[in-house]
Curated annotation (Swiss-Prot):
GO terms for molecular function: ATP binding; shikimate kinase activity. It holds the Pfam family GHMP_kinases_C. It comes from Methanocella arvoryzae (strain DSM 22066 / NBRC 105507 / MRE50). Belongs to the GHMP kinase family. Archaeal shikimate kinase subfamily. One of its GO terms (biological process) is amino acid biosynthetic process. GO terms for cellular component: cytoplasm. It is an enzyme of class 2 (transferase). The keyword rRNA processing does not apply. The gene is aroK. It catalyses: shikimate + ATP = 3-phosphoshikimate + ADP + H(+). This is Shikimate kinase. Keywords: Amino-acid biosynthesis, Aromatic amino acid biosynthesis, ATP-binding, Cytoplasm, Kinase, Nucleotide-binding, Transferase. Pathway: Metabolic intermediate biosynthesis; chorismate biosynthesis; chorismate from D-erythrose 4-phosphate and phosphoenolpyruvate: step 5/7. Coiled coil: none annotated.
Amino acid sequence: MKSHGTAYGAGTIINAIAVWKGSAFAIDLKTHATVELRGDLIEGEIEGGGDSRLIERACELTLDKLGVDSGAKIRTTSEIPIASGLKSSSAAANATIIATCRAARQSVDPLEMVRIGVQAALDVGVSVTGAFDDACASMLGGVVLTDNREKALLKREVLESKVVVYAPDKKAFSAQTDVKKSRLIAPWVETAFDIAMRGDYRKAMALNGFLYCSALGFSAEPILAALELGVTGVSLSGTGPSYVALVSEEGEEADRLKKAWSAYPGRVFVTEVINEGAFLLEGEECRWNT
């Protein structure tokens, strides 16, 4: 039995590391997974190489949940740069879980699929909090606000917006984040989260960005460059190194910010917030560029 799953990357409104409460939005960058149930072993393979423990554990936990005694072959491909703050791990786990459920011809509630992926991330040590907020955005689409400690979805909204992404060439793995320094800024991150709960996502993003840039040692220059152009919804994404900005769907705001950010080393591109749930997608077979 073989099937496919697709899940989205995401951008940060509030990083959950400081206070265990977070907010994120899905973006139009996808990870595809193909799962074939066969044999006794669970084996994962990532296009371009990489650590396959997360997708293997996500598949294993899903099969346990479904009561299916089988091995599996998992293959993933992705448009999301790894260790960039754009939620590549959440997308990989979600896509794998969706594909596994489909291969087993069974269905699981989307939030339960998210919780399986979060547990897999904690089990293999790729996340500090399990990234329930990022995983919810990746799976459900739109903007989400969550309590990561309780694995509770507090709020989900549709948001129509273009997104400008600046992805520097370097990488920053979430599991290597300086948690102690992040917890020092907790009172102010709590304030930013309250602002986000009131629906002022752009203001919350900017505050989150300045706070985490300071705590984690990233430059705030890209945020200031966006503010100079009147783009107020801008932040460091996750634990970096990427930055994301919400911009108008109309006019030249996206082009102006893309030009400004292109002065920095790395890649700049424009995408959009995705409001459709990944669990609704048909999924695509992984076609590797080999």
